[in-house]
Amino acid sequence: MAIKDLDFSDILDVSALKRDCDVIFKEDSKRIADIKSDLLPIFRRASTEGREKARELLKADGSGIDCARRISWLQDRLIETLYDLACQHVYPKDAPQIAVAAVGGYGRGTLAPGSDIDLLFLLPAKNTPDMHKAVEFVLYLLWDLGFKVGHATRTVDECIRLSKSDMTIRTAILEVRAICGRKSLTDDLEKRFESEVVTGTGPEFIAAKLAERDQRHRKAGDTRYLVEPNVKEGKGGLRDLHTLFWIAKYYYHVRDTADLVKLGVLSRSELKLFEKADDFLWAVRCQMHFITGKAEERLSFDIQREIADALNYQPRPGLSAVERFMKHYFLVAKDVGDLTRIVCAALEDRQAKDVPGLSGVLSRFAHRVRKIPGSVEFVEDRGRIALARPDVFKNDPVNLIRLFHIADINNLELHPDALRVVTRSLSLINDELRENEEANRLFLSILTSRRDPALTLRRMNEAGVLGKFIPEFGKIVAMMQFNMYHHYTVDEHLIRSVGVLSEVDKGTAVDAHPLANQLMPGVEEREALYVAVLLHDVAKGRQEDHSIAGARVARKLCQRFRLTGKQTETVVWLIEQHLLMSMVAQTRDLHDRKTITDFADKVQSMERLKMLLILTVCDIRAVGPGVWNGWKGQLLRSLYYETELLLSGGFSEVSRKERAQIARQALYDALEDWGQKARRKYTKLHYEPYLLTVALEDQVRHTRFMREADKQEKALSTMVRTHSFHAITEITVLAPDHPRLLSIITGACAAAGANIADAQIFTTSDGRALDTILINREFPIDEDETRRGANVGKLIEEVLSGKQRLPEMIATRTKSRRKKSAFTIPPSVTISNGLSNKFTVIEVECLDRPGLLADMTAVIADLSLDIHSARITTFGEKVIDTFYVTDLFGQKVTNDNRQASIAQRLKAVMSEQEDELRDRMPNGIIAHPDVAALPAARTAKA
């Protein structure tokens, strides 16, 4: 159906619009400028009301494609009316000689509420200045109405010439559509474009469009499972669907997607899949534009919940409404990938047949298929595995698994035609195949491959095989978790986890994960570890704890995979405890003996400890870019070594002292360019926790930093370093210790707009604090980030020395940055005396915000508590901070009423009800002559 044949008059009364315009032109004395001024409110009202009506109808019927067509129709009528006015009243002689056409996406008859309007003004070969003025009349009014108009004014000859050399222009003209004006010009352009540009250039166009698609994917994020996807440009988004249609239209000369069924390119069910995907993606995109009031293409967390509500998604047990919506989105993105493979396979087959004469014979001879050793079911076609016969899966469904296994061991790509048949054969994967011993043996071989198991698993997942073969995995395919911590869907996270394990297994991750690489060759149950890594989050999205439910799921699957009883118990334990090591390392004081003994009681064996460390590394690394950093690696290594000593019978305070002495000696030796007196002085400054936790390279850096500060007689100094691992900048602060030091440092970071990812708190034997703050990186270039870090360090120094007033800075800088969060996390405070023999442990969990850590540490100081150590941990938008505290007498807080008061005050801060605490922050507490007399906030061994 032609666009003009559609009737969307329920969103615009065209006759009424024209009558309102005619009234303005009845006054002959008006100048053009005055006429334009009078027309603007009329057209602005028509556009606004029409779009609002389109939004109401989208809410009512849910059809995204109809909404996009309504807005396109509305835009057509506005442009047509403006053009008619130019013809009738402004340039009656020349305006009728031009044509106004839509091109690009608008030419297809679809338009998102905030999208650009791409117009082509066609002029006859002999044109006049007034024709150009008529174009300007329409254009200027559209611009004055606030539309973003992409436009070109050309003759047909110019269009043909330019489209031959410019692929962007060629693609735009491919979907040219007459809106109004001299239709013969548009018809002539379409005919000449087909005969002079399209004919014989199909392969060239296809190659260009696919290359353009790949480049676009790399820019937008080369996975369709990013949890904040770009709906227009991202993988599996609208542009991918449109690229498919452009290619099909160009090569097959079709006018409509339905024509691809007649040509045998798509089946009827695949056409339905195309139309459903198109409709859904348009619904999402239109809602995004309506909700944000602009051409927003990124489906960010801020708007996901609102869009889920607008599209009428409801929560289900284990999944919120927004998570159900996003799962639907990712499943649609996967469908788009399936359709891409199907069309590409058909095109390749068609192109091979279309090569004429001797060239075709030679081409087919050069590209003949080759046998694959050991396989009669599959053949090699130009480095890709292809089917030897079309019925290979029907004859033996095990071949659906064998295909990927043979591709893996022979390092072959998958032929798109083979993938098309796989997609159409998924119904063959039934319970009988799932229980088949050979199928499970092949799958386990794929999973534990020494080559690239993640690549093969991802191919299986993209083809739909993985989720069908392991239905429990199928339940988490395309599932997102509505938080800022996880960057990928659950299935993509699990596959990436296997990829990290493979890197460790092959020894290619030595620099990033030295301990994991060292331990991996000694792991006795390699198969069990791979299974545990693949399945550790398989029960996400259920009402019960996913670790417990996942262990239960894994027990059944291990039997299917024919693992031994011992292997099964190992997998079950690893999945049940897969969060344990990460949480202990990041939220507990690793120098508190009870932390280690409690952890060792749960682990019980060295083999489990090795495997749990490796699983933890894989899990954190696969969460997303910037989540893993060197500090987390150091925490995990410290926990491993402490637990190893205990499990092997070597854990004692003596051994800790010996190890600390060895570390002290290593620092002494590393300062070989210093004199002995200076080496002895500075190596004696540090206590055991520092020596056993901080890497030697950092100890050397800190010691040189301290000596330089002493030479310059600086009581206060900061040092900045950007790390090679992603998204972290380190600021080290040397200052005399003080009760509110940590609060003021973190407050200064908040005032500077720096988000703290972690903090290391140490005190030296001469009463100074050596605190290292890790802040999230803001700039990609090291020089820019170093400059920014130095500015944060300078602000810390100015606040501590009294040059800047922190309360006002926090109040002005953080409040202006705050906005309503897309997330809600109920504040939680847990106070325990059972986690440490010496300290009361306060653990807080809440929504992160600028200045939160400063507020919490201020409250703790205000409550007359000493912070002996702290673990600052952020998981996306959620923060879990743990403080090891005593009262001013060095005792645990045991009084129930006092514990309740602490919890109440901290919850008030987390709910932003205690900003007045900032007013009581001291000003200039550090750089005073009598600073040494100030009370210590942290014991010497903090």
From Swiss-Prot:
Protein's gene: glnD
Record text on activity regulation: Uridylyltransferase (UTase) activity is inhibited by glutamine, while glutamine activates uridylyl-removing (UR) activity.
Official protein name in the record: Bifunctional uridylyltransferase/uridylyl-removing enzyme
Taxonomic placement: Bacteria, Pseudomonadati, Pseudomonadota, Alphaproteobacteria, Hyphomicrobiales
Region (Uridylyl-removing): 374-729
Free-text function comment from the UniProt entry: Modifies, by uridylylation and deuridylylation, the PII regulatory proteins (GlnB and homologs), in response to the nitrogen status of the cell that GlnD senses through the glutamine level. Under low glutamine levels, catalyzes the conversion of the PII proteins and UTP to PII-UMP and PPi, while under higher glutamine levels, GlnD hydrolyzes PII-UMP to PII and UMP (deuridylylation). Thus, controls uridylylation state and activity of the PII proteins, and plays an important role in the regulation of nitrogen assimilation and metabolism.
Superkingdom to which the source organism belongs: Bacteria
Record InterPro entries: ACT-like_dom_sf, ACT_dom, HD/PDEase_dom, HD_domain, NT_sf, PII_UdlTrfase/GS_AdlTrfase, Polymerase_NTP_transf_dom, UTase/UR
Residues covered by the ACT domain: 730-811, 841-920
SMART domains: HDc
Cofactors demanded by this protein: Mg(2+)
Annotated family: Belongs to the GlnD family.
Catalyzed reactions per annotation: [protein-PII]-L-tyrosine + UTP = [protein-PII]-uridylyl-L-tyrosine + diphosphate; [protein-PII]-uridylyl-L-tyrosine + H2O = [protein-PII]-L-tyrosine + UMP + H(+)
